[in-house]
């Protein structure tokens, strides 16, 4: 599959607009959504329950793995924070596509005090992940501002 996919990101952006939460999804090598996750920090009383972490957890459970085989990607409607970017590396995800960035966060806290790109670069000795930044940003940034 070629990344990025407008179809996949459009679905996640639609989910965010209609369900009022940041969304992420793990994508298999054939371009299928394996599992989605959305931010549940408040409802779960869990500061690690970001959309990306929840999507990775759900996909790992579904596939019965703790590290993805080659070809899996993560799509998310917001730039992954340092924790989520680290999880992308540890999970063996080959690429990440995100829509919005902290410049358009509105009232949201800026958890990206270290950019996703810097974390992915620093962890490249463990696992190399590609990155597509600001994909379809014009379709999502109005949600935050």
What annotation goes with each model-predicted range?
Residues 1-18, 86-145:
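Zinc-dependent deaminase
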Residues 22-31:
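Short beta-strand scaffold segments in enzyme catalytic cores
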Residues 32-41:
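Short beta->alpha transition motifs characteristic of CBS
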Residues 40-54, 58:
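A short, polar/charged loop-to-alpha-helix boundary motif
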Residues 62, 84-87:
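Cys/His-rich metal-chelating microdomains
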Residues 65-78:
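Immediate flanking context of iron-sulfur cluster ligation sites
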Residues 81:
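Conserved G/P- and acidic residue-centered "switch" motifs that form tight phosphate/ATP-binding loops
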């Amino acid at each position: 599959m070629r990344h990025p996919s407008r179809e996949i990101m459009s679905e996640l952006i639609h989910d965010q607009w209609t369900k009022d939460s940041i969304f992420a999804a793990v994508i298999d090598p054939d371009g299928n959504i394996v599992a989605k996750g959305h931010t549940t920090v408040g409802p779960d009383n869990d500061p690690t329950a970001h959309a990306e972490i929840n999507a990775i957890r759900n996909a790992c459970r579904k596939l019965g793995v703790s590290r993805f085989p080659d070809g899996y990607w993560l799509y998310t409607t917001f730039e992954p924070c340092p924790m989520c970017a680290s999880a992308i590396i540890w999970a063996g995800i080959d690429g990440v596509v995100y829509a919005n960035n902290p410049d358009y966060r509105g009232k949201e806290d800026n958890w990206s005090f270290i950019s996703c790109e810097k974390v992915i670069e620093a962890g490249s000795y463990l696992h190399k992940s590609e990155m597509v930044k600001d994909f379809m940003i014009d379709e999502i940034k109005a949600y935050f501002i």
